[in-house]
């Protein structure tokens, strides 16, 4: 236990010393500030009678809130893992009692915890501080969102953060390649934005299902903004599929990362 506490202190010092890492780690707080102050000003500047435009704008904002906060934590994890590979830190850790696999599991565990906490912080904060601002015809979209909904989404979304971080860091040999690969895979965070289009509200929505973050985001979006469609699943079903998919991807990428490091 003492070894892992020492590692945690080391990881936190590494993050605090690097301005970029510190920014990525604090992005959920920045997002919360935007969601409770800036975005509501955008809604107020729009014509309240134009329900369609207001609805689309809120959908886009909610997708940003649901996806970007945790995505930055995956970038942080990927960069830290690439740095470990680039500086041969993992080779040193391999001969310690923790071992490389133990260290990777530890890193994923605390990043997963950070992701879950940050997601709940953003959603609970937005709901309680500015929930009434996210309203159409006087009805707040956050009225549909329960504590269990937020916690469930955060737990599933955290799996995606860990899986994506391993995917991004597995194929990069150094920091330069790491930045390039991260930029290339960054589109994953933006693709769910297509859900605002009418064409992706029925069966075609499942074309986006290849993306591991689609399932939890889609389920949460339907809780916030209910949309009638025979193609839609229930909220628990979306989360269950998302959890299974991300766990499988996490296992595959964990083994891939260790194989890349070992050989």
Segments (PLM) and residue ranges:
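Hydrophobic alpha-helical transmembrane segments of multi-pass membrane transport/permease proteins
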Residues: 15-44, 59-76, 112-119, 182-195, ...
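Junction motif at the cytosolic side of a transmembrane helix
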Residues: 167, 224-228, 239-263
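Secretory targeting signals
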Residues: 113-160, 166
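Selective transmembrane-helix segments that form parts of the transport pathway or gating/packing helices
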Residues: 73, 98-131, 239-246
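Transmembrane helix boundary and interhelical loop/hinge segments in multi-pass membrane proteins
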Residues: 49, 74-96
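A structural motif at transmembrane helix-loop-helix junctions in multipass membrane proteins
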Residues: 19-23, 149-187
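Aromatic- and glycine-rich beta-strand/loop motifs that create alpha-glucan
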Residues: 1-28, 88, 262
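Short hydrophobic, aromatic-rich alpha-helical segments embedded in or entering the lipid bilayer
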Residues: 2-6, 198-230, 236
